[in-house]
Amino acid sequence: AIYTFIYPNNTPSDFCTVLGTRAGLVGPKGNATKFKRLLINRFLLETIVLSAVKLEDMPDGIELRELGELLRSQYYILIGTDTDKDYSLLDQAKIAQDAPEDLRGELASNARSIADMLITMGLAKRYADGVTIIGWGL
């Protein structure tokens, strides 16, 4: 009720977008872009991963693909671990058509970059077969 009283001409989504942008969690800054995205830093990534994965799964770990499914189902965050499914969701939301580059390739690159960041943080390990496992003490 307070929100609608103070900001009668904006939606809650507009408020969250502005708040996220000013906090540095959402970008790019400015009004030049139609769609905003999460700007992943180590703290935000660690928080999101640890909130999505059950603690009892961490000692043995889960695959990056499973993390992608968890983030998709719990938070509607697409990281590119299943490019076909993620692209389909972006296409349904009419976001894929506005992307200037090869979106499927960008999704796969995004998943690799997130895996690399998790590895440098000590939350994941990539094995010789290319599978990345997220967990403790791997």
Residue ranges with predicted function:
Residues 92-138:
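C-terminal engagement modules used by replication, chromatin/transcription, nuclear envelope/ESCRT
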Residues 39-62, 75:
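Positively charged, polyanion-binding regions of nucleic-acid-associated proteins
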Residues 43, 62, 66, 109, ...:
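Short, well-structured alpha-helical interface segments that form or flank functional binding sites
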Residues 58-72, 78-99:
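Short acidic, hydrophobic short linear motifs in intrinsically disordered regions
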Residues 1-46:
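Long, low-complexity, charged/polar intrinsically disordered regions in eukaryotic proteins
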Residues 5-9, 51, 55, 121:
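Surface-exposed polar/charged interaction patches
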